[in-house]
A protein has these predicted regions:
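Extreme N-terminal starter segment of soluble prokaryotic enzymes
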Residues: 3-5
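Residue-level detector of structured alpha->beta connecting loops
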Residues: 35, 72, 102-103
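Acidic, PIN/NYN-like endoribonuclease modules and their adjacent C-terminal/linker elements
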Residues: 84, 88, 92, 101-105, ...
Length: 144
């Protein structure tokens, strides 16, 4: 079974790298393990880079490069533009990319930024919901 490819909001990626013990951290671990892939476009990559470059994270250049090497072998897409109003227009690239993700799945800690009527069929999940969905896709261990 091929791993799903989902869009992860910047807040989920950052939280997962900084705190590997929560659900965002488990999702980042799944990306590293290859049991989850990222769907992203150049605008999302740019946002990831800009956020990580902020001094408040105190991350070394080597750590930053290790994080970004992870993103290079994911599912880079060029989604068609959507016409929908979101509370934060900067969130639109994530919703657009989600249209091309497995099950149109977008994982965010800010679901309120994506009102149901404006999601264009995308499934918005919290990190905990995403982890549960990912675990339900996995085959049971051999011998069980």
């Amino acid at each position: 079974m091929n791993p799903p490819s989902w869009v992860l909001d910047t807040n989920v990626i950052v939280s997962g790298v900084l705190n590997p013990h929560g659900y965002p951290g488990r999702l980042v671990d799944a990306i590293i393990a290859g049991t989850l892939r990222l769907t992203l476009d150049d605008r999302i990559l740019t946002e990831y880079r800009e956020v990580w470059a902020r001094s408040k994270f105190s991350i070394s250049r080597a750590q930053l490069e290790a994080i970004f090497s992870l993103f290079l072998n994911q599912d880079l897409v060029t989604p068609p533009p959507l016409t929908t109003d979101l509370p934060d227009p900067d969130d639109l690239p994530f919703l657009e990319a989600a249209q091309l993700a497995t099950d149109k799945t977008f994982v965010t800690g800010n679901a309120k930024h994506f009102p149901k009527a404006r999601r264009r069929g995308a499934t918005i999940l919290s990190p905990a919901q995403a982890w549960q969905k990912l675990c339900s896709r996995r085959p049971p261990p051999e011998g069980s």
